[in-house]
UniProtKB/Swiss-Prot annotation:
Keywords: Cell membrane, Membrane, NAD, Quinone, Translocase, Transmembrane, Transmembrane helix, Transport. The gene is nuoK. NCBIfam families: PRK05715.1-2, PRK05715.1-3. One of its GO terms (cellular component) is plasma membrane. It is a multi-pass membrane protein. NDH-1 shuttles electrons from NADH, via FMN and iron-sulfur (Fe-S) centers, to quinones in the respiratory chain. The immediate electron acceptor for the enzyme in this species is believed to be a menaquinone. Couples the redox reaction to proton translocation (for every two electrons transferred, four hydrogen ions are translocated across the cytoplasmic membrane), and thus conserves the redox energy in a proton gradient. It comes from Deinococcus geothermalis (strain DSM 11300 / CIP 105573 / AG-3a). One of its GO terms (molecular function) is NADH:ubiquinone reductase (non-electrogenic) activity. The chain crosses the membrane at residues 3-23, 29-49, 63-83. Belongs to the complex I subunit 4L family. It is an enzyme of class 7 (translocase). NDH-1 is composed of 15 different subunits. Subunits NuoA, H, J, K, L, M, N constitute the membrane sector of the complex. Gene3D superfamilies: 1.10.287.3510. It is found in: Cell membrane. This is NADH-quinone oxidoreductase subunit K.
Amino acid sequence: MAPTAYYVALSGLLFAIGMIGVLTRRTAIMIFLSVELMLNAANLALVAFARAWGDLTAQTAVFIVMTLAAAEVAIGLAIIVAIFRKRETTNVDDLATLKG
């Protein structure tokens, strides 16, 4: 089995990639996917530490977080589709303008 440090390093790399995606991308879909990548990176770190400490409670928490993330994906994509149907764009710069 790989040491915990490898999993934590991979988690940090995935989180950094997700953060770069949030900060540099302009479409709502890519920002949404980057946030999900960051959430999965946090889950990976939590599972790695739980395995190192022999605690099963954290794995249960990760399962609950994954369930909530699935609901978040469904709601988030529905909102993005509704915005696209109304505005015909998912560019967040275009969505920032207030129109009555």
